[in-house]
């Protein structure tokens, strides 16, 4: 027998807790990604040449700032403006569409970063692969422009796929024990189709990311076997670079899979079952993932680590000066 899920209301305590967690996640995510952006952008202001990896990190931080902003707007929408009788109002649809596009650009940039790591760290023996690695290193700016172009194309196609369908309501009456009325809205299905369509466009960069990460893993294995045979020195710059790059890529893979699963689960939770608490949990998971990867990127990048140490030393010296000033003022009194 077919059973329907009743629409559950969300208490004020749950909404307040979710909003508080969302504010914390937004603050942490905004600060970490804004830090990555400002450190690299400051070099641009000083007219210093950015490395290829710094250019990718600059673009990646911008896309994640958009992601965090959209997820925070989604949290505000869920807690204050969204009604369970009509969960997909126009503003929430726009937030979801923009999030899908920003997430798509984020994946393309991660694939570009993975290719860059491969071109720098892997020692190729085949002539074609050597030429390809050299081409990737030289054409990174064009690749970033291509990512922006692909994101714009995906934006147009997703918007066209969503808004080209008719938006009307089909009502089906099911006679059950309580004579419940089930409303199926075609616009809900349109959003789900657009969601699937955008995820299909994510397959090429995801495969590119997996292939390049796999090649880097194989290269690390070969390098470790070579070290065991020819040297006993445990400290090797190339090995450390391989490990840092793989740590960044593996963490992105884990965070991206978790975030994508949460996003995919949130759609039927919202459209079919009207489970706002489940959607809140999914949005919280989606907001935590970019912050975690940004923290790993900061810990694995020498320039960003130096900037963090500079800020910490400045804060420590400022606190010490204030403490000494207060002690001197008390002595004078």
Swiss-Prot record:
Residues 1-17, 77-94, 164-190, 273-276 are extracellular. One of its GO terms (molecular function) is bitter taste receptor activity. SUPFAM superfamilies: Family A G protein-coupled receptor-like. Expressed in subsets of taste receptor cells of the tongue and exclusively in gustducin-positive cells. Expressed in testis. The keyword Signal does not apply. It is found in: Membrane. It is a multi-pass membrane protein. Gene3D superfamilies: Rhodopsin 7-helix transmembrane proteins. The chain crosses the membrane at residues 18-38, 56-76, 95-115, 143-163, 191-211, 252-272, 277-297. InterPro entries: TAS2R, TAS2R38. GO terms for cellular component: membrane; plasma membrane. GO terms for biological process: detection of chemical stimulus involved in sensory perception of bitter taste. Keywords: G-protein coupled receptor, Glycoprotein, Membrane, Receptor, Sensory transduction, Taste, Transducer, Transmembrane, Transmembrane helix. It comes from the Eukaryota. The keyword S-adenosyl-L-methionine does not apply. Glycans are attached at residues 89, 178. Residues 39-55, 116-142, 212-251, 298-333 are cytoplasmic. Most taste cells may be activated by a limited number of bitter compounds; individual taste cells can discriminate among bitter stimuli. PANTHER family: TASTE RECEPTOR TYPE 2, TASTE RECEPTOR TYPE 2 MEMBER 38. Receptor that may play a role in the perception of bitterness and is gustducin-linked. May play a role in sensing the chemical composition of the gastrointestinal content. The activity of this receptor may stimulate alpha gustducin, mediate PLC-beta-2 activation and lead to the gating of TRPM5. Belongs to the G-protein coupled receptor T2R family. This is Taste receptor type 2 member 38.
